[in-house]
Amino acid sequence: MPNSIIKKYPSKGKLFYVIGASGVGKDSLLHYARQRLANESLVFAHRYITRPVELKGENHIQLTKEEFNNRLQRGCFKFNWHSHELDYGIGVEVDRWLMQGSNVVINGSRGYLNTAVALHPGLVPVLIQVDSNLLHERLIKRGRETLEQIEKRIQRAQAFVGLTSPNMQIIENNSELSVAGEQLVSLLRNQAVKIL
């Protein structure tokens, strides 16, 4: 599948690229931060995914495979990747928000990190981590995957142990949601470009 058509725009805002293994609590942490930072100069971008929308979990825009490919061919995605038999995209609207001075938070992919950094060198990677035993427990509890799929996700998580990138920020999510949630809120507030 071809990569998205990329146009580089001057960025006044900062791009935060939140990543972590399935089950580390990214969706919960992003939801927590979105509520706490609702009145600040941060925009939480939605993802376009070839997965049905669920009542609990990520608030994304569901696309069929055909719709996704159509948007990909038309250059509608700033970032796009394929993982766990699904296609994911971040829309080019993110560039407009950044150009207008908004700070933008996106739910990214560890496997796409190097490409994202190459396309947007100033982005801030935020890695959410959790102990491996807790990760397995959370994947079972959320009930979204089969046991075989859970095992594949655990193996993929192990493949990314030691992931590094310039300016990488790390948040451990091994206790109450509010602990890691407040760390994420503080990080976003402190590193966001202040709009005068």
UniProtKB/Swiss-Prot annotation:
Keywords: ATP-binding, Nucleotide-binding, Transferase. SUPFAM superfamilies: P-loop containing nucleoside triphosphate hydrolases (SSF52540). SMART domains: GuKc. One of its GO terms (molecular function) is ribose 1,5-bisphosphate phosphokinase activity. It catalyses: alpha-D-ribose 1,5-bisphosphate + ATP = 5-phospho-alpha-D-ribose 1-diphosphate + ADP. The keyword Nucleotide-binding applies. It comes from the Bacteria. Its EC number is 2.7.4.23. Pathway: Metabolic intermediate biosynthesis; 5-phospho-alpha-D-ribose 1-diphosphate biosynthesis; 5-phospho-alpha-D-ribose 1-diphosphate from D-ribose 5-phosphate (route II): step 3/3. Gene3D superfamilies: P-loop containing nucleotide triphosphate hydrolases (3.40.50.300). GO terms for biological process: 5-phosphoribose 1-diphosphate biosynthetic process; organic phosphonate metabolic process. NCBIfam families: phosphon_PhnN, PRK10078.1. Belongs to the ribose 1,5-bisphosphokinase family. Catalyzes the phosphorylation of ribose 1,5-bisphosphate to 5-phospho-D-ribosyl alpha-1-diphosphate (PRPP). This is Ribose 1,5-bisphosphate phosphokinase PhnN. It comes from Psychromonas ingrahamii (strain DSM 17664 / CCUG 51855 / 37).
